[in-house]
Amino acid sequence: MAVEMFYDADADLSIIQGRKVAVIGYGSQGHAHSLSLRDSGVEVKVGLKEGSKSRDKVTEQGLDVDTPAEVAKWADVIMLLAPDTAQAEIFTKDIEPNLEDGNALFFGHGLNIHFGLIKPPANVTIGMVAPKGPGHLVRRQFVDGKGVPCLIAVDQDPKGEGQALALSYAAAIGGARAGVIKTTFKDETETDLFGEQAVLCGGTEELVKTGFDVMVEAGYEPELAYFEVLHELKLIVDLMYEGGIARMNYSVSDTAEFGGYLSGPRVIDADTKKRMQDILKDIQDGTFVKRLVANVEGGNKELEGLRKQNAEHPIEVTGKKLRDLMSWVDRPITETA
């Protein structure tokens, strides 16, 4: 079944312009949403806890800021863009006591609603607007008169206005200039988590580290291994990003293309696919989210342990040394702090 797509001509910007919007959180997405909503003629306030380091930045950029509870009380549309693991507490403490009949609660990701970590009252519209790009790109494209494609979804719609409101919001941050795709909280959440775990973060990271280990254990210099399995990965991903797998294969040498066809299926085989299916099942049945919640309730001890273990891999030592030679590479905060 083809996805439903919407564009500026399908959206009524006046809907969101007639509402008061609170954006809770001012990270990557929060700043892009807030500034673009304001520039689209929407009345916006940003919700940040007292003492937040981002408060000065908000006021410097000409936006009003108050506590999450106060902006939730003021608004009739609340966009919750705090980290996933903080959202349930913010909802219970700051948002739920201030919700009124007819309010709308929006999210940039469906995890907390789909897995029942947040249970909103039945008289509130529950929607999602999820740009498919980082906040700095969302904002830059908006300023340039363009946009980043967005997903929208409605999980609860007591007044029958959810889709029109979500589409209007997406248009106000530039999404409808590029295209807005209708989905569900379930599909957005499960596909997003699977992509992160099996391919983008977990899968790619382990592939790179294992490739590095194989070469170093075979006697090759760590510096050569780093260049071949990590540094050059960006070149390949950029080609795929621009034109798909076909563009990448067209652009590399015949030797690389031929070798990739022969050896790729030996690395990622039917057993790998079965394990990826198991990962998807753990996401779908809530196994992963239960472990995520247990980690948070345990003070992030499991996550901190995994971070420490990962940081000690030899590829990190080699990489830092080589990046010192690369004047064109922006140094990450982990190496400049």
Curated annotation (Swiss-Prot):
Binding site for substrate: S253
Catalytic reactions on record: (2R)-2,3-dihydroxy-3-methylbutanoate + NADP(+) = (2S)-2-acetolactate + NADPH + H(+); (2R,3R)-2,3-dihydroxy-3-methylpentanoate + NADP(+) = (S)-2-ethyl-2-hydroxy-3-oxobutanoate + NADPH + H(+)
Entry binding sites for NADP(+): Y26, G27, S28, Q29, K49, S52, S54, D84, T85, A86, Q87, G135
Record-linked InterPro entries: 6-PGluconate_DH-like_C_sf, KARI, KARI_C, KARI_N, KARI_prok, NAD(P)-bd_dom_sf
Cofactor(s) recorded in Swiss-Prot or TrEMBL: Mg(2+)
Binding site for Mg(2+) 1: D192, E196
Superkingdom of origin: Bacteria
Enzyme Commission number: 1.1.1.86
Pathway per the UniProt entry: Amino-acid biosynthesis; L-isoleucine biosynthesis; L-isoleucine from 2-oxobutanoate: step 2/4; Amino-acid biosynthesis; L-valine biosynthesis; L-valine from pyruvate: step 2/4
Residues the record lists as binding Mg(2+) 2: D192, E228, E232
Location of the KARI N-terminal Rossmann domain: 3-183
Cross-referenced Pfam families: KARI_C, KARI_N
Cofactor binding note from Swiss-Prot or TrEMBL: Binds 2 magnesium ions per subunit.
Catalytic center residues: H109
Record-level GO cellular component terms: cytosol
Keyword tRNA processing listed: no
Any one of the GO BP annotations: isoleucine biosynthetic process
GO molecular function terms listed in the Swiss-Prot or TrEMBL record: ketol-acid reductoisomerase activity; magnesium ion binding; NADP binding
Domain KARI C-terminal knotted: 184-329
Keywords, ordered alphabetically: Amino-acid biosynthesis, Branched-chain amino acid biosynthesis, Magnesium, Metal-binding, NADP, Oxidoreductase
Summary of the function given for this chain in its UniProt record: Involved in the biosynthesis of branched-chain amino acids (BCAA). Catalyzes an alkyl-migration followed by a ketol-acid reduction of (S)-2-acetolactate (S2AL) to yield (R)-2,3-dihydroxy-isovalerate. In the isomerase reaction, S2AL is rearranged via a Mg-dependent methyl migration to produce 3-hydroxy-3-methyl-2-ketobutyrate (HMKB). In the reductase reaction, this 2-ketoacid undergoes a metal-dependent reduction by NADPH to yield (R)-2,3-dihydroxy-isovalerate.
HAMAP family: IlvC
Similarity comment text for this entry: Belongs to the ketol-acid reductoisomerase family.
Name of protein: Ketol-acid reductoisomerase (NADP(+))
Species in which this protein is naturally found: Mycolicibacterium gilvum (strain PYR-GCK)
Classification of source organism: Bacteria, Bacillati, Actinomycetota, Actinomycetes, Mycobacteriales
Gene field: ilvC
